[in-house]
């Protein structure tokens, strides 16, 4: 009996071990058939994509409680294309953005990031969608720098920025080149320090400089430090290609349908041909003259922002109620007699009547713009009509179509407008010759003044909020340091 029992037990042990081994084998084999969700599938499953960006006038900012910015709008378009929610994670510097990306707290970074060899070693980049040129910036009135090796004074750039990478590379050729980095200041803060004379130089992309000059006209382009550099979205390097392939597909479609060209026109299409004297004069008058008429613009603005109406008035008359031109137009909005009569204006030199009449006429033009024109571009077509007449604006659209371009895209029509001054072309259109080049410049100027007024108004609102906070917290000690955004952002994302 004992011998039998021992044999049985041994046999049962063998069967048990065989069973366990078989189960382990089946488990391992089963693993071969299990495929984890791709990065893109994970984004769709959680219903959101986390995009890091940087506060600034080109990437991301809040205005009138609405998120705006080239990079923000492009990221929002991508999220909509994927059918998920966009979660924007804004920080103050490229260094903070890189840290979040390295820690896997972001799906991608969209912040006018220049593709460099150093960054390619760390991250994967999507397709390039525009190019920038790095500029050394100095203050108007200071000696113009002639050579990077002869710079005298302080050069300060944001830590981790393309400017820092570029200076480090240039130092190989110019050993005497010295600079410092600031982790707490972003590009626009450093530009303000240059404008205020607190530092001598900084390095920024040409697109940022062009927009910021509208607020700080003292900023002057010195040297171009490198050939054009490519801007692209950055993401963590992974074996999984799903997100990368999706981004390539998205950009391909957006290039084809003109969406990226439209965004480029919206944010950068009006910032060329900077004029120091004109910009400085405008900012001075915006502070001294505009407050006198501001309530009138707010009262009579109809289909447009009151600040746009004020910008039109400045372009027309420099806010001078008695303004008159050789063509006979008069007043704050420089109305012709027939237009004034049609809009119910009896005295063109009366500020309230002129502003109300101009607002009505602009509304009339906007209502006539064809429905096929996108809503956010109607105003530029209406302004063209305001300046040279509705018929000439429609001639420009027809000519644009004849040339194989898009008559509903302002970026295309504005390039065709100057052709209305050439006999070869104005003979072909219904209303003949028009000062199309002037009309294009007119719209560009209005857009520049409008952006400056938006900035000034935003600065005033921020100042009021700071005053309110100071009053509320006057009994508590105030910190002069900017909060460390990255720690709070990481904490918020981790707690999701």
From Swiss-Prot:
Keyword Lyase: yes
Catalytic center residues: 316
Cysteines paired by S-S bonds: none
Catalytic activity: Exolytic cleavage of the (1->4)-beta-glycosidic linkage between N-acetylmuramic acid (MurNAc) and N-acetylglucosamine (GlcNAc) residues in peptidoglycan, from either the reducing or the non-reducing ends of the peptidoglycan chains, with concomitant formation of a 1,6-anhydrobond in the MurNAc residue
Membrane topology type: Peripheral membrane protein
InterPro entries in the cross-refs: Lysozyme-like_dom_sf (IPR023346), MltF (IPR023703), Solute-binding_3/MltF_N (IPR001638), Transglyc_AS (IPR000189), Transglycosylase_SLT_dom_1 (IPR008258)
Top-level taxon: Bacteria
Region Non-LT domain, annotated ranges: 32-271
Any one GO molecular function term: peptidoglycan lytic transglycosylase activity
PROSITE patterns reported for this sequence: PROKAR_LIPOPROTEIN, TRANSGLYCOSYLASE
Subcellular location: Cell outer membrane
Region (LT domain): 273-496
GO annotation (BP), single: cell wall macromolecule catabolic process
Function: Murein-degrading enzyme that degrades murein glycan strands and insoluble, high-molecular weight murein sacculi, with the concomitant formation of a 1,6-anhydromuramoyl product. Lytic transglycosylases (LTs) play an integral role in the metabolism of the peptidoglycan (PG) sacculus. Their lytic action creates space within the PG sacculus to allow for its expansion as well as for the insertion of various structures such as secretion systems and flagella.
Descriptive protein name: Membrane-bound lytic murein transglycosylase F
Source organism of the structure: Aeromonas salmonicida (strain A449)
Gene giving rise to this polypeptide: mltF
